[in-house]
Swiss-Prot record:
<feature type="transmembrane region" description="Helical">
    <location>
        <begin position="204"/>
        <end position="224"/>
    </location>
</feature>
<dbReference type="InterPro" id="IPR002541">
    <property type="entry name" value="Cyt_c_assembly"/>
</dbReference>
<dbReference type="InterPro" id="IPR003557">
    <property type="entry name" value="Cyt_c_biogenesis_CcmC"/>
</dbReference>
<feature type="transmembrane region" description="Helical">
    <location>
        <begin position="26"/>
        <end position="46"/>
    </location>
</feature>
<dbReference type="GO" id="GO:0004096">
    <property type="term" value="F:catalase activity"/>
</dbReference>
<feature type="transmembrane region" description="Helical">
    <location>
        <begin position="162"/>
        <end position="182"/>
    </location>
</feature>
<dbReference type="GO" id="GO:0005886">
    <property type="term" value="C:plasma membrane"/>
</dbReference>
<dbReference type="GO" id="GO:0020037">
    <property type="term" value="F:heme binding"/>
</dbReference>
<keyword id="KW-0201">Cytochrome c-type biogenesis</keyword>
<dbReference type="GO" id="GO:0009247">
    <property type="term" value="P:glycolipid biosynthetic process"/>
</dbReference>
<dbReference type="GO" id="GO:0002049">
    <property type="term" value="P:pyoverdine biosynthetic process"/>
</dbReference>
<protein>
    <recommendedName>
        <fullName>Heme exporter protein C</fullName>
    </recommendedName>
</protein>
<dbReference type="GO" id="GO:0071978">
    <property type="term" value="P:bacterial-type flagellum-dependent swarming motility"/>
</dbReference>
<feature type="transmembrane region" description="Helical">
    <location>
        <begin position="66"/>
        <end position="86"/>
    </location>
</feature>
<feature type="transmembrane region" description="Helical">
    <location>
        <begin position="131"/>
        <end position="151"/>
    </location>
</feature>
<keyword id="KW-0997">Cell inner membrane</keyword>
<keyword id="KW-1133">Transmembrane helix</keyword>
Amino acid sequence: MMNWTWFHKLGSPKWFYEISGRWLPWFAVAAALLIVTGCVWGLAFAPPDYQQGNSFRIIYIHVPAAFLAQSCYVMLAVAGAVGLIWKMKIADVAVQCAAPIGAWMTFVALLTGAVWGKPTWGAWWVWDARLTAMLILLFLYFGIIALGQAISNRDSAAKACAVLAIVGVVNIPIIKYSVEWWNTLHQPATFTITEKPAMPVEMWLPLLIMVLGFYCFFAAMLLVRMRLEVLKRESRTAWAKAEVKALVEKAR
């Protein structure tokens, strides 16, 4: 029988703050090592593409950002559902803290895609199905951020953001399968679970390292933001006051 103790413990802001403090350094170090390794390998040592030459190297930023942008939104939807069903405050904190990170990753994916598209397609932007769906994803992130800031009541804001996150998740399969459902300029998926990558190993391995690095970076950034938000929300409790006092004394 599965042990759900950890899930119930997540409902405790104090427990989350303590356990996340142990995870944070590991994610931060892993992110730094993986991103530096992937960048140096991919940008300096990976062979050029036989068609696109060195312009393809932007893939080492574009693909990880696009992966993370979509994964982050799925996480928002899951956290939103947990918050609505189990009334778990940490889930609401996760939604509020992850949305800006996801928005930035979506923006980076769109920006690098535009830079890559100029030499490849001859245009900075085309109303391609996948590009349009990614733009909608950015607006969904903006909507969640705006709702969280516009609604003064914290519980009402959490519910509104959760509903938007859950409804908007329908856009994720559209992004993923748009290249299969419609005729698009965008290339098929770089990685699939069932098929070996078409590019040689010296090109896709640094890309995989970058993807893992971006996920570790996301985890580290999310934990930092959530820990600060938890301290803010629990500022009247004894444990939060003690933690803030310890942090202030440590900073001196």
